[in-house]
Amino acid sequence: MSSRQGGKMKPLKQKKKQQQDLDPEDIAFKEKQKADAAAKKALMANMKSGKPLVGGGIKKSGKK
């Protein structure tokens, strides 16, 4: 038998995250990941709106 019966249980406390010392390489890697995520988000938005993924496509010449 537990001392708590019914009601809402309190959430467990989590330890505070320690601040890590980041190298310049780590900072550059995180910025690259952010840029890739932003580019992917923009690409997905273009796909949803129906825009073509590539600009070229098949070019038809006027000559026969």
UniProtKB/Swiss-Prot annotation:
Segments of skewed composition (Basic and acidic residues): 27-38
InterPro entries: TMA7 (IPR015157)
Ranges of biased composition (kind: Gly residues): 53-64
GO cellular component: cytoplasm; nucleus
Region (Disordered): 1-38, 45-64
Localization (cell): Cytoplasm; Nucleus
Gene Ontology biological process terms from the UniProt entry: cytoplasmic translation
Residues that span the membrane, as ranges: none
Keywords: Cytoplasm, Nucleus, Protein biosynthesis
Endoplasmic reticulum as UniProt keyword: no
PANTHER family recorded: TRANSLATION MACHINERY-ASSOCIATED PROTEIN 7
Function description: Involved in protein synthesis.
Family, as annotated: Belongs to the TMA7 family.
Complex and partners: Interacts with the 40S ribosomal subunit.
Protein name: Translation machinery-associated protein 7
